[in-house]
């Protein structure tokens, strides 16, 4: 599996994630530029990550240096933040993202969460008063306008349950191309994958390694005994086993490392397959969702429980 392996929609199967704790523009710019030189072509960002500008700078530098022939050789995903998840704010928000990226379009624009906040609410912690009802129809109609204007080649969602996708599909004139959600061997998303496959929606995995080291991540994936046993028996790293498993599900995956050796390793999971026995053992791993989205739940907000946020699909 290489960085150039693509879905039917033209999205590279492996993307480099850029969610970081606090703004670090120069290290991100350098890491993205090196990733392009190594062979990455898909970069995942979001307004909330504050990494759009350094990605744009790295992309421009890569074109100047000849690492890629043009911006068109790259696939850039960004996301609409909750405070702009209002019908009249979506197009302006994407235009702001494009200014940050110094680009005329993004390849994929996603609704980051099925959540709306008051305009201007960008940084956690959030209060109950920050949340307002999510007008899915108005937001999606504005997302469709982004596509019609040529600002986004494709549009999609993130962190949507089967139920929310079903609601969206009931009125969408342009269906979502992608649903980006947590997927890893500890949270395998069998029901959601089957639903998306039946609707022609590409599942894209974030946190395929469990987001160890983040404020909400867990060691549960990398420390799973089954995965460690398989890795040892195959002469692979646990990360390679996880990424190979996600790849074999047909999902795209977003993986983040700014360490060059790991960036290379994350691309180099081709030329081997998990055995049926290994797949069976992974399928039996006890399931638990890692990124629960607790910050979006409030007694006074639209989602009063995790069950409501995820429609019972956790």
Swiss-Prot record:
Induction: Up-regulated under iron-deficient conditions in root tissues. The active site is at 49 (proton donor). NADP(+) binds at residues 44, 158-159, 180, 258-266, 273-281. GO terms for biological process: response to iron ion starvation; siderophore biosynthetic process. Substrate binds at residue 112. It catalyses: 2'-deoxymugineate + NAD(+) = 3''-deamino-3''-oxonicotianamine + NADH + H(+); 2'-deoxymugineate + NADP(+) = 3''-deamino-3''-oxonicotianamine + NADPH + H(+). Residues 1-21 are annotated as: Disordered. CDD domains: AKR_AKR4A_4B. Its EC number is 1.1.1.285. Keywords: Iron, NADP, Oxidoreductase. Optimum pH is 8-9. Signal peptide: none annotated. Catalyzes the reduction of a 3''-keto intermediate during the biosynthesis of 2'-deoxymugineic acid (DMA) from L-Met. Involved in the formation of phytosiderophores (MAs) belonging to the mugineic acid family and required to acquire iron. This is Deoxymugineic acid synthase 1. It comes from Hordeum vulgare (Barley). The gene is DMAS1.
